[in-house]
Amino acid sequence: MSKTVLATAVAAALTFGAAEASAQTQGTASKADVQAIQTQMTTLIERLEKLEATNAQLQTTNAELKTLADRREAEVDYLKAQTRELREEGAIATNEISKVKGTDWASKVKLRGDLRYRHEYVGTERLVDDSVDDAADRHRQRIRARFGIDAAVTDNVKATLAFATGGDDPRSSNQTLGGVATRKPVGLDMAYVDWKFMAGGNVLLGKQPNPIFRPGQSLFYDGDFNPEGLAVKFDRGMFFGTAYGWWLTEQFNSDPDGANADSRIVGLQAGLKFPLLGGETILAANYYECGLCQGESPLYANNPNGNTTFRVGTSTTNLLTYGYEVVEVGAQVGTNVGTLPLTLWANYAQNLADDVEYDTAYGAGFALGKASNARTWEAGAFYQSIDKDAVYAQWLDSDFGNGNTDADGWVLKAGFAPVRNFTVNATYFFNTLNKDVDTELDYDRLQLDVNYKF
């Protein structure tokens, strides 16, 4: 604009100068004409100055408007970019939430199981006309399949369901092959809730794994025995313990006088563990009482498994002659021989109930190595003796002494793991039956196992 005004002023000056020169030359212009031209020039200059001022103001306004527009455009671009980012983040979050929802239940559930294939040989003696003779050898093959589900209900509550072959036998989940390839039964092996009510404290409700500590390879309890009822466990620092109450039989209004004759087990175990010899040593004492067992029949399949019984009249029902108030003590010492773990153990039990003659059981043994990781092995041996009424026999190991009390003898064990979760095991029992009562009989049992875990 300033260049235009300057050009106009110069043009006007030149015009005025030319007019004045022409007037002097021609001598015809009057003084009034010159003044008129000067007045017009002054007016023109004033108008030009006003136009220049107006133009400058317009330029300033335009600059401000342009700056504001640029700012608005920048803000719009920023908002658009933020919107895109939020949409992308929202899409990612939605996808992650979807994944979490889809896998949340899976993270709280664990599946486990194992499968065992066994070849078994049993050789025993028998009485024939009051003389001892060899019974026919028995060969059979058996399978065991177990499957479990552990679900975290809350941070301190876990629910477990487990199923196993073997029918309803409380001491065995083995299924003998045969029956012309019939389908084999599968039963509820465990169903319980584990509530961690405090640090080191748990309550188990339902059909649960045996919570009693068993030293070493002791066979006072069968490994398949899963009691039913309540257990409260404590394990903190060097101290541990378990109080338990288990159902045996529920016999509503079965007594002749109209009273109930429900048989139960109640007991308490306490122990401590501490470091010794480069390993851990565990000492424990356990006491249980079989309530309403004497004179009753808390027996699976009416089989006392060696405990003393009697019958009434012509009844074929076996009734327990004695009560069972059993105290147990056990010790287990863990150490190492070179790089191999070594476990030494011993346990002792006695039935404190009245008038029991054969009331003592004991065992001791060792285990060297551990067949767990690839190319690892284990071996062990122990001796065990169980008097006829030393323990309540319904949960006694089902293999030692043909699954009965009134037996003693040795057990040899060996195992090898070619790879992890796969082991080959051999166990040999050479026992004596009827060590307290009747005629002694030799009993041999060989088990060859292939075990898979998953």
Descriptions of predicted regions:
Residues 44, 48-51, 147, 193, ...:
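Residue-level detector of buried hydrophobic side-chain packing
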Residues 197-203, 211-372, 376-379, 383, ...:
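Signature for the C-terminal beta-barrel architecture of outer-membrane proteins
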Residues 118-144, 150-199, 211-222, 254-256, ...:
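Surface-exposed loop and membrane-interface regions of Gram-negative outer-membrane beta-barrel proteins
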Residues 110-114, 148, 160, 192, ...:
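Soluble periplasmic/extracytoplasmic beta-strand elements of cell-envelope proteins
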Residues 2-132, 454:
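N-terminal periplasmic/intermembrane-space "pro-region" immediately following the signal or transit peptide
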Residues 107-109, 143-145, 189, 228, ...:
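Envelope-exposed proteins and targeting segments
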Residues 370-372, 385-389, 394-454:
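C-terminal functional modules
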